[in-house]
C-alpha cells in the first residue's frame, strides 16, 4: 500500500523492479489525482509518470484507457525499460 496526498495506491505490476517509492513520491504531482492508474517508466535515469483511467470511466479517452497500456509501453517507453503500474484504491 502506497499513500500519497491522501490517496492510496496498490502496486499491481512491477516490471524489472521499476518501482521506487521515494522516486515516485518525489515525482508525483496533484495533476495525477484524477486518474485510476499511475504508470511510471524509467528512461535515462529519469522517472516519468502517466495517468490512465479504468476502461469504464466516463472521463477516459482511447489513449487514457488502461487497456491501452501495452501500446503505450511499446510506443513511448524505451525498449525493455523498467516500469510499474499503481492502481488507486477508492473507498
From Swiss-Prot:
UniProt xrefs under Gene3D superfamilies: 3.50.4.20
Keywords: Disulfide bond, Toxin-antitoxin system
Keyword presence, Disulfide bond: yes
Pfam families: YutD-like
Domain of life: Bacteria
Disulfide topology: 77-81
InterPro entries: YutD-like, YutD-like_sf
UniProt keyword Disulfide bond, yes or no: yes
Task performed by this protein: Probable antitoxin component of a putative type VII toxin-antitoxin (TA) system. Probably neutralizes cognate toxin YutE.
Subunit structure: Homodimer, probably forms a complex with cognate toxin YutE.
The protein, known as: Putative antitoxin YutD
Organism: Bacillus subtilis (strain 168)
Gene: yutD
Amino acid at each position: 500500500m502506497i499513500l500519497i496526498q491522501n490517496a492510496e495506491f496498490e502496486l499491481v505490476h512491477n516490471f524489472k523492479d521499476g518501482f521506487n517509492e521515494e522516486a515516485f513520491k518525489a515525482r508525483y504531482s496533484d495533476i495525477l489525482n484524477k486518474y485510476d492508474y499511475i504508470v511510471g517508466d524509467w528512461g535515462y535515469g529519469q522517472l516519468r509518470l502517466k495517468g490512465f483511467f479504468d476502461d469504464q470511466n466516463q472521463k477516459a479517452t482511447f489513449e487514457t484507457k488502461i487497456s491501452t497500456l501495452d501500446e503505450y509501453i511499446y510506443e513511448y517507453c524505451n525498449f525493455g525499460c523498467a516500469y510499474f503500474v499503481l492502481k488507486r484504491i477508492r473507498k
